[in-house]
Design a protein with these regions (language model features):
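Conserved beta-strand segments of the P-loop GTPase G domain that flank and frequently precede/overlap
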Residues: 106-107, 150, 180-182, 208-210
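P-loop NTPase motor domains
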Residues: 1-175, 257-278, 286-288, 292-312
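P-loop NTPase motor core of the ASCE superfamily
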Residues: 101, 165-168, 187-312
Length: 312
């Protein structure tokens, strides 16, 4: 509630995240309350809510503000704070971005995920919320141009809380989501068992790579792939000579051990109402756009500074 009030006050007053960070560091600062009381567009009751939080029992207040400080930990990095405090003319306009049909790249690293992931997550959630609101004003309730979210390492880089619902109903609003996870266990750890199951069920196309190690998940995928008919040939010998027979049996189309040991570059594709497909994937360096990608990598990969010292 405190951070919500701070962000609302900043938006009303044209303040920056630097100001918000200052309010977080100084709980007694009267500026946000003054803004919430004076601004005509302020949400009713929010000023009083912030006053009540500030006047709470010291132990309770300290606990609340400790949580607020953790929420803005990423802003302690001057580079992150600078990126989140642009001049008014350079601020990111989600509505204009959606209308323009551009591409937004959000990059993160494993080392920075604990601090920066909340910011990336908030940006993605804001983008999705803006897309839903914009879609509601369009014919058929679908966004045009549509929005595609390619969420690689979704559980680490941008673990958006609404992802299970987004996979379930985002397509109806023109929002297509591609979610890449290391395993179903990773999804359960981030969104809980119910959330992970909802995501798995909502995904219209599931692409499974090799290397999974969770036996229950492998069995689940194997059962989804279904069974195939196999013939068992038997031969016996009796007084009348040899005799043969053929009896049918059902075998898993994709046994657990086959799923686990899929070679690199191979995948099992499970799409709704269609049999499983064993696909051989084409890496980008073997695809038709390889030269363009290499050229882009060369132009945008930072080169070592000339004259830099090299440690022996």
């Amino acid at each position: 509630a405190v951070l919500r009030c701070y962000l609302h006050a900043a938006a009303l007053d044209g303040a920056s995240m630097r100001d918000v960070l200052g309010w977080v560091a100084r709980p007694a600062d009267p500026a946000p309350v003054r803004i919430l009381r004076a601004a005509s567009g302020a949400a009713p009751g929010w000023a009083e809510e912030l006053v009540a939080q500030s006047a709470a029992d010291p132990r309770t207040r300290d606990s609340v503000w400790a949580g607020v400080r953790r929420a803005v930990d990423a802003l302690a990095d001057p580079r992150v704070l600078e990126a989140c405090s642009p001049p008014a003319e350079q601020q990111f306009d989600t509505a204009a971005f959606l209308r323009g049909g551009g591409t937004l790249y959000l990059l993160g690293t494993t080392g920075a995920q604990l601090t920066v992931a909340p910011l990336i997550t908030a940006l993605v959630e804001d983008l999705v919320d803006a897309a839903r609101r914009q879609a509601a004003t369009m014919t058929g309730g679908r966004l045009d141009p549509p929005l595609t979210l390619l969420l690689d390492e979704a559980a680490n880089i941008a673990p958006i809380p609404s992802l299970p619902n987004l996979l379930a109903d985002g397509g109806g609003s023109g929002v297509t989501t591609v979610c890449v996870l290391q395993s179903l266990a990773q999804a359960r750890a981030r969104w809980g068992p119910a959330g992970a199951d909802a995501m798995w069920d909502a995904a219209t196309t599931k692409v499974v790579l090799g290397g999974l190690a969770h036996a229950d998940d492998l069995s689940r995928i194997s059962r989804l792939a279904g069974d195939i008919d196999d013939a068992v040939h038997t031969r016996s010998y009796g007084p009348s000579g040899p005799a043969g027979s053929v009896s049918p049996r059902r075998l898993p189309a994709m046994p657990v051990e086959r799923l686990r040991t899929l070679p690199v570059g191979h995948a099992i594709v499970l799409a709704r109402r269609t049999p499983p497909v064993h696909a051989v994937l084409t890496p980008w360096w073997a695809g038709p756009h390889a030269d363009r990608i290499r050229d882009t990598l060369d132009r945008h990969t930072a080169a070592p500074e000339s004259g830099a010292e090299t440690a022996a």
